[in-house]
Curated annotation (Swiss-Prot):
Topology in membrane: Multi-pass membrane protein
Organism, scientific name: Mus musculus (Mouse)
Matches recorded under PROSITE patterns: ZF_RING_1, ZF_RING_2
Subcellular location: Endoplasmic reticulum membrane
Quaternary structure, from the entry: Interacts with BNIP1.
UniProt EC number: 2.3.2.27
Domain text: The RING-type domain is required for ubiquitination.
Pathway(s) of this molecule: Protein modification; protein ubiquitination
ZnF locations on chain (RING-type): 39-85
Known catalytic reactions: S-ubiquitinyl-[E2 ubiquitin-conjugating enzyme]-L-cysteine + [acceptor protein]-L-lysine = [E2 ubiquitin-conjugating enzyme]-L-cysteine + N(6)-ubiquitinyl-[acceptor protein]-L-lysine
Chief place where the protein resides: endoplasmic reticulum
Protein's name in the database: E3 ubiquitin-protein ligase RNF186
Job of this protein: E3 ubiquitin protein ligase that is part of an apoptotic signaling pathway activated by endoplasmic reticulum stress. Stimulates the expression of proteins specific of the unfolded protein response (UPR), ubiquitinates BNIP1 and regulates its localization to the mitochondrion and induces calcium release from the endoplasmic reticulum that ultimately leads to cell apoptosis. Plays a role in the maintenance of intestinal homeostasis and clearance of enteric pathogens.
GO biological process, one term: protein localization to mitochondrion
Length: 226
């Protein structure tokens, strides 16, 4: 009478390594090792700089850790295995002369799916996410206020110019030229006054340089954040 023992549960936190044997298309056996693709010493994942190297005891570690463990013993460069303490000779002290763990190198060489990013869409989404709801209203108010100030300055300058012309022209240009110049100055003064009283009549698409500069600065800040 044979008794069967129940399998013991594996404690939590234990890292297991499974080996899968499959029949390849050529009729040969292909062995794939599944485990953590990281060094057992530094716990860093294997990559081009930390290539997995195989010691004589068949234990695998990254090239960086093996280079730190390299020492000279009896005029020979050697590396003690951190697990079993077996010494592996390294010809010339070159870590690259050690064999690579082909199973792990093959898994590292698997192509990863490419992720394509569109900077224009990222900037657009970030700008739309950070732009407040009253963005257009603030821009229109800034444009109207700046245009109003500019029109007032123009009106003051034209008024001063008209006073100067009225005082100087009788002594320099008598006759019809004086009245023509006075009419032109009065017309310009009237137009500037209309602009001051009715700034909404201007096209809202005409933005002043200060508003354009502020908009470009905000867009630059949004792009840098994205």
């Amino acid at each position: 009478m044979s008794c069967t023992e129940a399998p013991q549960p594996i404690p939590a936190g234990t890292t297991t390594t499974s080996t899968i044997i499959a029949l390849g298309p050529t009729g040969r056996l292909s062995i794939s090792v599944e485990g953590d693709l990281e060094c057992l010493v530094c716990r860093e994942p294997y990559n081009c700089a930390r290539s997995p190297k195989l010691l004589s005891c068949q234990h695998t570690f990254c090239a960086v850790c093996l280079k730190l463990l390299l020492y000279v013993q009896e005029d020979t460069w050697s590396i003690p295995c951190p697990l079993c303490r077996k010494v592996t000779a390294v010809p010339g002290g070159l870590i690259c002369s050690l064999r690579d763990q082909e199973a792990m190198v093959g898994r590292l060489a698997l192509p990863c799916p490419e992720v394509r990013l569109c900077p224009q869409r990222l900037v657009g989404s970030a700008a739309s996410a950070t732009r407040p709801a009253n963005w257009t209203g603030e821009e229109e108010q800034d444009t109207v206020s700046v245009n109003r100030v500019a029109a007032r300055r123009l009106a003051v300058h034209l008024l001063l110019l008209a006073l100067v012309i009225v005082l100087i022209l009788p002594f320099i240009y008598p006759g019809v030229i004086r009245w023509v110049l006075a009419f032109v100055i009065a017309l310009a003064l009237l137009m500037s006054t209309l602009f001051c009283c009715h700034p909404q009549s201007q096209n809202s698409n005409w933005l002043c340089p200060r508003t354009l500069f502020c908009r470009e600065q905000k867009q630059t800040q949004i792009t840098s954040i994205a």
